[in-house]
Amino acid sequence: MKIRPLHDRVVVRRMEEERTTAGGIVIPDSATEKPTRGEIIAVGPGKVLENGDVRALAVKVGDVVLFGKYSGTEVKISGQELVVMREDDIMGVIEK
């Protein structure tokens, strides 16, 4: 199954955070928070403006983004846990 987001929504796959500290200490699953960065796997066509025009999104498939831990709605599709959120929920794109 595939998801196609509408309007200014994007679908993000969370990226795993580092589970060891700089000193080599392993952090258990129970002590880690949900990752707040992920890779965009699908984008909607854009935001519909008041005059009816559609403004394209500033992000694209493959971008690694930073978002708030309470952003979007979690969904499970084809065994993958994904987050559907508005472009406004994205704080920034992490550049390589």
Swiss-Prot record:
SMART domains assigned to the protein according to its UniProt record, in alphabetical order: Cpn10
Keywords in alphabetical order: Chaperone, Cytoplasm, Stress response
PROSITE patterns recorded: CHAPERONINS_CPN10
Any one cellular-component term (Gene Ontology): cytoplasm
SUPFAM superfamilies: GroES-like
Keyword Cytoplasm: yes
UniProt xrefs under Pfam families: Cpn10
CDD domains with a match to the protein in the record: cpn10 (cd00320)
Subcellular location(s) per record: Cytoplasm
GO terms for MF: ATP binding; metal ion binding; protein folding chaperone; protein-folding chaperone binding; unfolded protein binding
Source organism, top-level taxon: Bacteria
InterPro entries from the UniProt entry: Chaperonin_GroES, Chaperonin_GroES_sf, Chaprnonin_Cpn10_CS, GroES-like_sf
Record GO biological process: chaperone cofactor-dependent protein refolding
Function as written in the Swiss-Prot or TrEMBL entry: Together with the chaperonin GroEL, plays an essential role in assisting protein folding. The GroEL-GroES system forms a nano-cage that allows encapsulation of the non-native substrate proteins and provides a physical environment optimized to promote and accelerate protein folding. GroES binds to the apical surface of the GroEL ring, thereby capping the opening of the GroEL channel.
Family the UniProt entry places it in: Belongs to the GroES chaperonin family.
Subunit structure of this chain's protein: Heptamer of 7 subunits arranged in a ring. Interacts with the chaperonin GroEL.
Name used for this protein in its record: Co-chaperonin GroES
Species name: Legionella micdadei (Tatlockia micdadei)
